[in-house]
Every structure is written in C-alpha cells, then in structure tokens.
C-alpha cells in the first residue's frame, strides 16, 4: 500500500567532495543541486549576476564622473571667481572707459587680478552641423593666463591664444566634426557668417566656448570687439566677502551685475545630487 519510492537523484560533483559538502546547509545543498542539474538555470544565474555587477560598476563610474564635473571645470580649467557684466549704456558715456573701469577694480582689495573680455553667444557651424557657443575675446591675452587653462584633455599639453586661430572646446569640436587646422563658420546675430581657423581643441565640461585674441577677432570679423564684461580672480578676503564685494561693485553705474562661480557650482552640485 506504500507509494513507490522515487528514483534516486543524480549526485552532483560537489557531493563527492565530502569535506566540503558536509559543511553546507540544507538550502546551500539544494541550491547547488539545482544549479548543476539544470544547466539553463546555471547559465541564467551566472549571466544575471554578471550583468547586475556590470551595471553597478557602470553606475558608480557614471556617478563619479558626473559628480566631478563642476570641480573639473572650475578647479582645473576656468579659474576665475566672478564675472562683472558692464552697463554699456553708461560705459559709452565715459571719456576713457578702460581707465575708469580699471580703477574701480584696482580699488577693491578683494580682487587679486582681472581681465576685460567680450563674451557673446554665437552660432558655430561646419557643414550642416551647428552649435551655439560663447565667443570669448580677451583684451589682454596675458591677463587671461591666470584665469584659464587651455590644455588637451588627453595629453595635458597646454596651449596659448594667438592671432593665428581660435581655440574650440572639445565637445563642440566633436559635434562639429572638426579638429586642429580645420575651419569653422561663426555667425553673430543677423550678420553674415565669417570663417576662422581652429588652432587648438581644449578640455572642457560645461557649455561650449570659442576663445580668441583681440587680433584674431579683428582679423576674422573686420571690426573691433565690444567688451562687455570683466572676469575677476579674488583673493582670500574677496572670496570670504563675496556679497559685500558684489554690492560695492554694483553701486557703480558702470557695473550691471556680478555673478559668482561659487553660486554656479552650488547650483550644479544641487542638480547633480538629485540623481542619487
């Protein structure tokens, strides 16, 4: 009347290794039996664990890369601390704008050094590829050396701004499909496009930029640049009292706004922190 006993199951290889098998729990023994007996389950288990581990590695790598963007940009490339936008309606009234504005900056003890720049949004194109970028022209290229690092991302070779060509940021150069020695078209507003030679391609992580000297700008556009901004590098005291410094600068009619890199960094870090 007793039911027929089931056929004895096949023993897996691990069962023959007694000193290991005896120390396994029931659930562990059951797991190993299922894995060795059912090859599809074994393959799916190994494949699943491998894919999951791979995704975790990629995820952690992306997190580290993304979270370091602000630090890479503002600690290694753009080294200035603030941007003071000029009120051109007021500066145009001055007999000697450079002298007046330079005196304003020099009288602020919190400002270590400064550079007068022209910064405008323009369309950069090559063939059918078009990107919008900030075109930056510095009145004194040497003054920019302490505020910008023009270098290759891969070799870390540093570049100098010259009148022979422009420096493009890497992501834009890739999007346009251009490199050193190629030419790009630059369109400012409703004006006809002009062409410029790409002298170098530089490391960059936030937004697109085209950098050129005053001489290069005049050669390309056949006109003088309109300077509308000062880049400021602050000392320790200036960084500790940014609000007060900004307010004093904006008390001058010639200064329209003051924007701090620290504020931009906080905004970027805040947006990125929401990703995890």
Name each model feature, range by range.
Residues 91-100, 237-247:
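Short, conserved charged micro-motifs
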Residues 77-78, 160-161, 201-243, 262:
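Small-residue transmembrane helix packing/gating motifs
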Residues 157-216:
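Hydrophobic secondary-structure segments that place a key small or acidic residue at a functional site
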Residues 80, 131, 164, 182, ...:
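Envelope-exposed proteins and targeting segments
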Residues 1-44:
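Alpha-helical transmembrane segments of integral membrane proteins
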Residues 62, 66-75, 242-276:
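Peri-transmembrane interface segments
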């Amino acid at each position: 009347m007793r039911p027929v006993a089931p056929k004895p199951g096949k023993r897996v290889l691990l069962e023959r290794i007694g000193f290991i098998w005896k120390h396994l729990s029931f659930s562990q023994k059951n797991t190993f039996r299922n894995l060795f007996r059912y090859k599809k389950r074994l393959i799916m288990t190994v494949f699943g664990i491998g894919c999951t581990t791979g995704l975790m590695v990629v995820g952690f790598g992306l997190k580290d890369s993304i979270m370091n963007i602000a630090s890479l940009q503002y600690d290694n490339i753009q080294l200035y601390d603030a941007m003071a936008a000029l009120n051109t309606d007021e500066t145009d009234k001055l007999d000697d704008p450079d002298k007046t504005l330079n005196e304003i900056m020099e009288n602020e003890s919190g400002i270590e050094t400064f550079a007068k720049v022209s910064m405008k949004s323009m369309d950069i194109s090559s063939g059918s590829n078009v990107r919008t970028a900030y075109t930056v022209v510095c009145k004194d290229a040497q003054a920019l050396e302490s505020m910008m690092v023009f270098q290759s991302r891969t070799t870390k070779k540093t570049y100098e701004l010259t009148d022979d060509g422009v420096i493009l940021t890497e992501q834009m150069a890739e999007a346009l499909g251009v490199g050193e020695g190629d030419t790009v078209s630059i369109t400012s507003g409703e004006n006809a496009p002009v062409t410029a030679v790409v002298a170098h391609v530089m490391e960059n992580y936030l937004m697109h930029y085209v950098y050129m000297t005053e001489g290069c700008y005049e050669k390309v556009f056949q006109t003088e640049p309109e300077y509308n901004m000062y880049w400021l590098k602050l000392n320790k005291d200036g960084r500790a009292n940014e609000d007060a410094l900004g307010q004093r600068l904006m008390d001058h009619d010639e200064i329209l706004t003051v924007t701090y890199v620290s504020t931009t960094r906080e905004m970027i870090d805040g947006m990125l922190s929401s990703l995890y």
